[in-house]
Design a protein with these regions (language model features):
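Extended, low-complexity cationic-aromatic segments
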Residues: 40-42, 51, 168
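Structured nucleic-acid-interacting core domains from mobile-element enzymes and related host factors
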Residues: 17-43, 108-110
Length: 195
């Protein structure tokens, strides 16, 4: 890091303590009798105090099992929470399309819409509303990309309450309780202490 500070070192120590205390934690894949694709996307708007860039994250589940996830600090500054969430939605739709193509090649894809969960109603409204507003002109390409997938029935957007948002742990720091709840939702277990 080019401008490391003591808070960065504290964050590294926190991560190392977590990893040391959870050596057997990993993903458990279960057969759930279906291969439905669901995904969650989230963004933490203007979270970086240095440059006000946002962090976006997503999780993709196939058959209830976590198969893909990403957390990334974005290279641009968003003007609103809705814009940050909408750009995160665009990233997860791209990933869901890749998963869809993989399942198609494996001949296991069911012809049902893949659900994308987002906790920002404004971002969902932008996707469904074909009218371009001055405040969303700069996300026009993402709008047409998502709108095309909605209209063709490939994806379906749904609202999830913040408490049910699985991608929260990829965009912001969580307390111990919230982290454990989110890890359980992702299918993570501790092989040394199974529940």
């Amino acid at each position: 890091m080019h401008d490391s500070r003591s808070k960065h070192l504290d964050a590294v120590y926190r991560i190392l303590r977590y990893l040391k205390s959870n050596p057997g934690k990993g993903l458990m894949f279960r057969s759930n009798g279906h291969l439905n694709v669901e995904s969650y996307c989230d963004a933490d708007w203007a979270s970086c105090l240095d440059d006000r860039r946002y962090t976006s994250g997503y999780c993709v589940f196939v058959g209830g099992n976590l198969v893909s996830w990403r957390s990334k600090k974005q290279s641009v500054v968003s003007r609103s929470t809705a814009e940050a969430e909408y750009k995160a939605m665009s990233l997860v739709v791209s990933e869901v399309l890749w998963v869809r193509n993989l399942l198609t090649e494996l001949n296991v894809l069911r012809n049902v819409p893949m659900r994308v969960w987002c906790d920002n109603k404004s971002a969902i409204n932008i996707a469904y509303n074909p009218v371009q507003h001055d405040r969303t002109k700069h996300v026009e390409i993402d709008h047409f990309f998502i709108k095309e997938k909605l209209d063709s029935g490939i994806i379906e957007l749904s609202h999830v309450n913040s408490g049910g948002q699985v991608a929260d742990c990829l965009t912001k720091s969580l307390g111990v309780k919230e982290c454990n709840v989110t890890c359980n939702k992702m299918g993570m277990i501790d092989i040394y202490h199974p529940s």
